[in-house]
Regions:
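A short, basic/flexible loop-to-alpha-helix module at the beginning of a structural domain
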Residues: 37-40, 101-107, 346-348
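Short, polar loop motifs at secondary-structure junctions
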Residues: 70-80, 149-152, 248-252, 271-272
């Protein structure tokens, strides 16, 4: 993996207007940064240490220095050792995201990033998309699809149960880099409101971004103090999306579509509005475990079979179909992928 110099990290922070002050000697600017860390216990020689978190304590920086840190990045209030080389920033979370992208050599630029946000259905839709893409990739003898979800994470090197929906920016960039190293072409991920609010996905550009729905949820002193904060966090997503797939059946659709204009292209889907780009009709419950419907697009008008019942899963499937169309996946792979798709035993 390419290694960047300390001066490169300073440059990218300056480019994003995050730097307030640089307090270090020119002699260390050409130091190769071998590690990026926000956990002081993991610091080694030539580490760029990030002072972040509500629970940050000065002793963490002291430990990082003892363990061999080259310099640290901090907001003004956490500059607890002014004599040690440091970079002062105005937003530590955006700074962490920016330097994480650089440390892993901007992996999101080398893979199709597919992000999903919404109150409900993210996990199911993520697995629908993965199943469709995996069917296509298998047919062409290509690596399968990486996924970062609230259920589990698979990046070609690691396969593990997920602890949170969207990981911290440095961990996310590692997963993306692993997928790139494994020659994967696509990565599907859930993008939570917290990830957007706390800038964990800052500087990640999505080839496809799906906005499933919005309703009052996650309102608490821990996550979002009110619905407006929650909704505004979700809407930040569109600024990072090239092709936006939007559910016309969602509440607050006018505001969603207004913000979706930030994307280069909007693809709509619906079970109610025939004018949608991807429209489901003739929905039939076949058994207690299966449902069928016809889907009409500009390219095809065909029947789809799902082995996960419920109208909400028809909406999730439409989102997956819209995504597949953006990526030019043929209908046969869409059909095959949805027919066998399961969300790791969980039905949303």
């Amino acid at each position: 993996m390419k290694r960047y110099l300390l001066k490169d990290y300073i440059d990218i922070l300056k480019k994003e207007n995050l730097v307030e002050d640089v307090c270090l000697c020119d002699s260390i600017l050409n130091t190769s940064i071998e590690k990026l860390e926000h956990n002081s216990k993991e610091v080694a020689n030539n580490t760029l240490y990030i002072c972040k978190g509500l629970n940050y304590k000065p002793e963490y920086l002291n430990e990082a220095i003892v363990r061999g840190a080259t310099a640290y990045i901090s907001e003004p209030e956490n500059v607890t050792d002014p004599d040690f080389p440091h970079i002062v920033v105005n937003d530590i979370r955006k700074a962490l995201a920016a330097v994480s992208c650089m440390y892993y050599d901007f992996p999101a630029d080398k893979i199709n990033m597919i992000g999903l946000t919404g109150t409900k259905g993210k996990s199911t839709t993520a697995y629908y998309i993965k199943s469709i893409l995996d069917d296509y990739m298998k047919e062409h003898n290509l690596p399968d699809t990486a996924i970062v979800s609230s259920i589990d994470t698979y990046d070609g090197k690691e396969c593990k149960e997920s602890l949170i929906t969207s990981p911290e920016s440095i961990d996310l960039q590692e997963h993306i880099a692993n997928a790139v190293d494994c020659k994967m072409q696509n990565l599907v991920m859930e993008v939570s409101s917290q990830a957007l609010k706390l800038d964990r996905v800052h500087d990640v550009l999505y080839k496809v971004g799906v906005f499933l729905n919005i309703s009052e949820d996650h309102i608490s002193t821990i996550e979002h103090p009110n619905f407006e904060d929650y909704f505004a966090s979700k809407l930040k997503f569109f600024a990072q999306v090239e092709n936006a797939c939007v559910n016309l059946d969602s509440d607050y659709i006018d505001r969603i579509l207004e913000n979706a204009q930030k994307s280069k292209k909007i693809i709509t889907f619906s079970t109610k509005n025939e004018k949608a780009d991807v429209f489901a009709y003739d929905i039939k419950k076949l058994t207690h475990t299966s449902i069928s419907f016809r889907v009409k697009t500009s390219k095809f008008d065909e029947e789809i079979l799902l082995t996960m019942p419920g109208l909400f899963n028809v909406e999730n499937a439409l989102a997956a179909i819209a995504t597949a169309m953006v990526l030019d996946i043929p209908f046969k792979n869409i059909y095959n992928g949805l027919k066998v798709a399961r969300a790791s035993g969980r039905m949303e």
